[in-house]
Amino acid sequence: MKAGIHPDYKKVVFMDTNTGFKFLSGSTRGSNETVEWEDGNTYPLLKVEISSDSHPFYTGRQKFATADGRVDRFNKKYGLK
């Protein structure tokens, strides 16, 4: 591997802006904002709009859209099924 071409991988804190949920993970992204984590160390803070704490798939508040297709509309129009 060539030296100096790979991004710097470090620990950062991600914060869900909708719920305020924070988690520590590794990333190559940096930030000017920092936050003190539970272990007492200071890490860069990256704000995200959606995470597993607020995404409907993970929270169980998922809504399923039911769209009638052409066949369903045909059957409904002509009284079939």
Curated annotation (Swiss-Prot):
One of its GO terms (cellular component) is ribosome. InterPro entries: Ribosomal_bL28/bL31-like_sf, Ribosomal_bL31, Ribosomal_bL31_B, Ribosomal_bL31_sf. PROSITE patterns: RIBOSOMAL_L31. GO terms for molecular function: structural constituent of ribosome. Belongs to the bacterial ribosomal protein bL31 family. Type B subfamily. Part of the 50S ribosomal subunit. This is Large ribosomal subunit protein bL31B. It comes from Bacillus cereus (strain AH187). The lineage of its organism: Bacteria, Bacillati, Bacillota, Bacilli, Bacillales. The gene is rpmE2.
